[in-house]
Regions:
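WD40-like beta-propeller blades
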Residues: 1-271
Length: 271
């Protein structure tokens, strides 16, 4: 069993001595943004980046920051697969889907009002009735309604698992795309219920999830107290406690790979 002090000591040795010296990074002027940025999101392969603010969005190429397209929106999300696939919440009752940067579908969510969007392998619409409604990117068909007040939605890279975080916990569900495809192809989608058998609850996380990231079937997250944890099936493990800074779990898996390789997940404390 590793104690907290030992975890902190191991992390200090992994990361090397902290000198707090400034890194000599060469800056390059790539231009100025035409709006006040309040949110920045890369697409799934990092080739494009969306800058959003003041109910507008601009999509740039990630390296040269060349303007690709722009528009007005209340919310913006990227697809979990398509390079140029994204969705915008145009109004409280209309969502537009774009395939390869061209408008493809218009979705009118089956809820009194949509209050937000979640990206990933399905389009998630945050309903005004404390729910999240999932829609297919290609067809725009209604997949399923999950009755939880979602704060954030985290999809695994494979798309077969999803974590829905709320204000006081989280729910990890499995997603069966094979059940959705034939129902969509044969037009057997219920406007009220979507497609039965697409989602199943695997387990709950009785903790606040402030940010998170999937690595395979393992969900790693930071809670509101700055504690880094991970879950595998119904088991929850503690990685380490961040003492000085409130950090976010980044999209890069390099840090997570270091933890797994150097410390070893199975050596950590089972909570």
């Amino acid at each position: 069993m590793l104690e907290d002090w030992y975890l902190r000591a191991r992390m200090a040795s992994l990361m090397g001595k902290t000198t707090q010296e400034r890194l000599p990074i060469i800056r390059r002027d790539l231009g100025a943004c035409e709006l006040y940025p309040q949110m920045l999101k890369h697409n799934y392969n990092g080739r494009f980046v969306a800058v959003c603010g003041d109910e507008e969005f601009i999509i740039y190429t990630a390296q040269a920051l060349r303007n690709k397209t722009f528009g007005q929106t209340l919310d913006f999300v990227w697809s979990g697969t398509g390079t140029g696939d994204y969705a915008i919440r145009e109004t409280i009752n209309r969502v537009k889907v774009f395939k390869n940067f061209k408008e493809s579908k218009t979705i009118k969510p089956a809820t009194s009002s949509s209050e937000g969007l979640f990206g990933g392998h399905l389009i998630g619409v945050k309903g005004g009735d404390s729910s999240v409604l999932f829609y297919d990117w290609d067809s725009g068909e209604f997949i399923r309604k999950i009755d939880v007040a979602a704060k954030e939605v985290y999809w695994s890279d494979s798309g077969n698992m999803v974590c829905i975080a709320t204000s006081d916990g989280a729910y990890v569900l499995s997603y069966n795309a094979q059940a959705a495809a034939p129902a969509i192809a044969m037009g057997q989608v219920s406007p009220e219920d979507g497609i039965d058998g697409t989602f199943d609850l695997l387990y709950e996380i009785n903790d606040n999830v402030s940010s998170g990231k999937w690595v395979g079937d393992c969900f790693i997250y930071m809670n509101n107290n700055g504690r880094l944890n991970y879950t595998v099936s119904v088991d929850k493990f503690k990685l380490l406690f961040i003492l000085r800074h409130q950090l976010l779990v980044l999209q890069s898996t390099q840090f997570l790979d270091i933890l797994q390789r150097k410390i070893g997940f199975m050596s950590l404390i089972n909570l």
